[in-house]
Amino acid sequence: MNEDITPKKPNAIIEWIDYRLPIFAFLKHFSHYQTPKNLNYLWNLGSIAGIALVIQIITGVILAMHYTPHVDHAFDSVERIMRNVNYGWLLRYTHAVGASMFFAAVYLHIARGLYYGSYKAPRELLWHIGIIIFLTMMATAFMGYVLPWGQMSYWGATVITNLFSAIPLIGEFIVTWLWGGFSVDNPTLNRFFSLHYLLPFIIVALVMLHLVALHQHGSNNPKGIDVKSPKDTIPFHPYYTVKDFVGFGVYFIIFAYFIFYEPNYLGHPDNYIPANPLVTPAHIVPEWYFLPFYAILRAMPSKLGGVLLMFGSIFVLFLLPWLDTSKVRSSNYRPIYRMAFWIFMADCLLLGYLGGQPAEEPYITISRFAACYYFFHVLVALPLIGKYEKPLPLPEEL
């Protein structure tokens, strides 16, 4: 029997829409997008972070329908969501745990980029947009942490906003402007609620830019070499969509475990106490994803020095494409840098641990050494290793 090979006639309605708004052509581009054939499961993390962002926006919008941004009612409105709103407990825990899962995916995404040199030419702007997304996430998460108006929310807002007072000449003015008064109060809560609602949509716009930059030169790969021929690539769909769904399955299993069994494991019990400006908690601790930077902040005895180091530890990431002088991207072919990378990862984990400890000895001294190594790795070790390291021979093809 002869097989009918007549091409399928396109749908007239789809053609009409596509001519005016090429949304179907855009989706076709995504499904036929050529991707390096050797990507491993670490390349799932971008898609996982995208799913996490969608979950945060959906749950956040629904929670905002029941939340009251007023210092006299905010704490009670959160408790009412937990007790009286249908599945309110699930919405709140999904949103709270989802923030941690989002940051976990992004931190692993950044670590993968550092290991495989995804910040190197021609992907510098892709890396920079990613760091801007990370900064916007931090601002969004900080403001969201204030909204339940518990003890840790109030005092966390007080401590972090007070950091701007370290800026010479204009610091006090900035703090008063942020507060909308002379202390953290109702205007502060309203501003933070408004910005917390707005910033996720700005993150979506930045993610779109991130994807445009990604599609300009394509994904990096574990070997860190450029695609040289069509045989080095495969279509994104179905090969990597199926692989992504495996990653989603693992992600949602971990996500569900924390929601249903340990929803408050990553939080702080003091935030179940209503905010009281007259009682300072014994130990003010931010969320876990801020702890490494909090440790760097506390490592400096001077307030201004700590603020500069904390922000510098993030902004220095913008310089990585030029600080790393090696022509080889992947750490698989850079034995010395690979060792330095894992020491750097251990240092970041140590800073995270130290950020959660009381501001006393020996934690302060260890924090100083760990903060020094953080900057030493990025500003000194990275350029020197790239200059003097002898990499292994690179393969000719994927």
UniProtKB/Swiss-Prot annotation:
Protein name: Cytochrome b
Disulfide partners: none
Binding annotation for heme b b566: H109, H210
GO molecular function: metal ion binding; ubiquinol-cytochrome-c reductase activity
Function as written in the Swiss-Prot or TrEMBL entry: Component of the ubiquinol-cytochrome c reductase complex (complex III or cytochrome b-c1 complex), which is a respiratory chain that generates an electrochemical potential coupled to ATP synthesis.
UniProt-annotated binding residues for heme b b562: H95, H196
Pfam families xref list: Cytochrom_B_C (PF00032), Cytochrome_B (PF00033)
Protein family membership: Belongs to the cytochrome b family.
Description of how the protein assembles with itself and partners: The main subunits of complex b-c1 are: cytochrome b, cytochrome c1 and the Rieske protein.
Known cofactor(s): heme b
Domain of life: Bacteria
Transmembrane residue ranges: 45-65, 96-116, 129-149, 164-184, 192-212, 245-265, 277-297, 304-324, 339-359, 366-386
Record localization: Cell membrane
Principal location class: membrane
GO annotation (BP), single: respiratory electron transport chain
Organism (species): Rickettsia conorii (strain ATCC VR-613 / Malish 7)
Record GO cellular component, one term: respiratory chain complex III
Note: Heme 1 (or BL or b562) is low-potential and absorbs at about 562 nm, and heme 2 (or BH or b566) is high-potential and absorbs at about 566 nm.
Membrane disposition: Multi-pass membrane protein
Keywords, alphabetical: Cell membrane, Electron transport, Heme, Iron, Membrane, Metal-binding, Respiratory chain, Transmembrane, Transmembrane helix, Transport
Cofactor stoichiometry and binding remark: Binds 2 heme b groups non-covalently.
